[in-house]
């Protein structure tokens, strides 16, 4: 123990600390400065950035023994407060720099460190600074953050008035389609929004901290579990195993596909008989501190009989592979696609055919905030779970039988959360904390470290694909054949739905009258597959978009013109036989053409013998919704103070549920003249909010947006006075009229895809885009640099352009990572952000251009579609096509690491 007298945010603090204690822990736990966020705990993400004696440091790797007496420290709390924002914070709000917001305090503190030393930086200075200080963002694509720093610098330098950093309301008062800032933005940029780990510091005395005992092998029988030594460790309350679980000890995948050969009850909460993947949780140590719990977890002894581990789809699908789940074949689901005529004769007689084998790998989500959850038994006897769930009502039914409670005895609440990008479509820590709270009767808190985030949360499922096109010599597509094998890891939840995506999106964007294909889902012992932005489209469209370029080359056609020739037009149908609701792709290609020609000319002019430049194109398509007649519910309530509360369970993991709720409600309530700041929204809670469905598949703006629209329209009708005007709250109460009105909406025009043919109308609203990538390839090293990305986007009528821009920038950045660096194949090497190929700012170009070519959707609320999936449908395919354009070599298996490109160049 040592004494430190330091000044934090201008206030002298007399502290007694362990010399080895981390500055981040002291600031958060002893001083309550939870604006200092902790992400990676390895100095790789910058979320914990503070200014220490004039220098930006990462507090999570700075030990107190290195902090001098008298040190001056500035955290986000010292930069600005909600009522007194610093220009950087104002600029962050204005430019949409805070999406999930978890990284925002660290970025803003880092940016202040820059402006304190360089008051007039260039954009490249800003980018170099954030790269040097390892400030990582997974949401924004970095461009809005640089925009914010530049504008803040201009204000600080007196080049702009500070009023330029404030949103200007449109003259008509309408915020639909504007850049109205997110309602949560100020809390995010000031560090005052409490995320799961922050809330954990506010739990009552007696709260137990949990640590997982995890498998260090990928497949094994469990012969015994010895907890005796762990129980003697300091601070340990108990060690929970499968014997303490009161329910079925399984998370159900809620299987709805009749041809699935499994029953969905294959994922243990705490492993009992077998380990199915590396990192599986075998026991939970409950202790008085996280450190004590983790130390004791190392003392639990597990006797294992190791089994063959199948770490890829082909290995698990081999005839001699043992069943991972005894009684269920490893290949447990098949989805055919049968459209039009038999393709065999068509391929035999076609002018041109082309074929390719493709692979998209196990992309990790890599949020900056690791998984976190807590649970407690409420005074009403119910078990309450607070987590990063993006499907609170969905998860309620997935975990209730496993923990041993009826759904009405379990409550799920979505915390303010960092980005998830889909991994939280699957439950992760929810069942674990519920089991612990029920077993101990005490509040419990569980926080994953970053290694656990990487190793024990789901990943994008890898696909092995073979796709063939048959075409006329003029480029008209005649037929397609496809085969795709989906490695979904050991747990089946949603694996069948993901496999169906291949039938829906391989070849999407083009009129292909005749299709035959088969998708198969296989259980393996690698990490389980979960939803990831784009959900099946990045795999599907990588194959078909690369193949389109291969066909263009064989025909001697320009790749853009081949796409133009075959893009959807009236009378055409998509792969499942559905006619698109709008036909914007030809228009988008027409508008892209001059940009494309200019990019080609620039690439040709600037290419050298050592650095080759190229341009690539791809089309992206995705549906907004869950398959079939998806539905949502919302409530609109007039409050006594004249405000309106929109009640939904629209989970916000950075995509903008706050502005989605407020923007949609404001548009619907315009006749009433309600100001946007008078519209409130709710945090998802299964006990107090309606079932709005999960935040995945770009469904919420369409499904819950429509439900909000209906609820608000119904509220308007309820409030209308016969002679004009609207009743007040008091008038409604006096007349015994309701002040809270329900709105329901169902995608009634959608149908499920057929189990035998794959045909159907799965979505009533789709999103469409055309991507262009510009790259430079260093032929000596194989290193690919993306110089610029352009997306022509049709997203209907935009609810909020600021949120939409941010979603697109972030999706493009993730596409660059998917194409070039991101993977989770090596369980140990890829267990950190850097190891897994996280794209920092210098890997993402500052040139990210968006052109909206929007066509209002008949079934979208006020014409809107979804947003989030589109920007990650196929940007990686455009990048790979650009590498081919630059060098003449094609990469078929992602990611296109430099050594892989170099090997192809030398072949």
From Swiss-Prot:
Matching entries from CDD domains are given as: fer2
Q: Gene3D superfamilies per the record? A: 3.10.20.30, [2Fe-2S]-binding domain, Aldehyde oxidase/xanthine dehydrogenase, a/b hammerhead, Aldehyde oxidase/xanthine dehydrogenase, molybdopterin binding domain
Q: Does the keyword Metal-binding apply?
A: yes
- What keywords tag this UniProt record? 2Fe-2S, FAD, Flavoprotein, Iron, Iron-sulfur, Metal-binding, Molybdenum, NAD, Oxidoreductase
According to UniProt, the reaction catalysed is: an aldehyde + A + H2O = a carboxylate + AH2 + H(+)
- Where does this protein hold [2Fe-2S] cluster 1? 40, 45, 48, 60
Question: In what residue span(s) does the 2Fe-2S ferredoxin-type domain sit?
Answer: 2-79
> Enzyme class, one word?
oxidoreductase
Q: Which cofactor does it need?
A: Mo-molybdopterin cytosine dinucleotide; [2Fe-2S] cluster
What does the entry list as the binding residues for Mo-molybdopterin cytosine dinucleotide? 653, 869
Pfam families per the UniProt record, alphabetical? Ald_Xan_dh_C (PF01315), Fer2 (PF00111), Fer2_2 (PF01799), MoCoBD_1 (PF02738), MoCoBD_2 (PF20256)
Q: Which InterPro entries match?
A: 2Fe-2S-bd, 2Fe-2S-bd_dom_sf, 2Fe-2S_ferredoxin-like_sf, 2Fe-2S_ferredoxin-type, 2Fe2S_fd_BS, Ald_Oxase/Xan_DH_a/b, Ald_Oxase/Xan_DH_a/b_sf, Ald_Oxase/xanthine_DH-like
The molecular function GO annotations come to: 2 iron, 2 sulfur cluster binding; aldehyde dehydrogenase (FAD-independent) activity; iron ion binding
Q: Does the keyword Membrane apply?
A: no
Cofactor: binding comment:
Binds 1 Mo-molybdopterin cytosine dinucleotide (Mo-MCD) cofactor per subunit. Binds 2 [2Fe-2S] clusters per subunit.
Q: What is its EC number?
A: 1.2.99.7
**Chain positions recorded as [2Fe-2S] cluster 2 binding sites:** 100, 103, 137, 139
Family statement drawn from the similarity comment of this UniProt entry: Belongs to the xanthine dehydrogenase family.
Subunit-structure text: Homodimer.
Q: Protein name, please?
A: Aldehyde oxidoreductase
Task: Give the species.
Answer: Megalodesulfovibrio gigas (Desulfovibrio gigas)
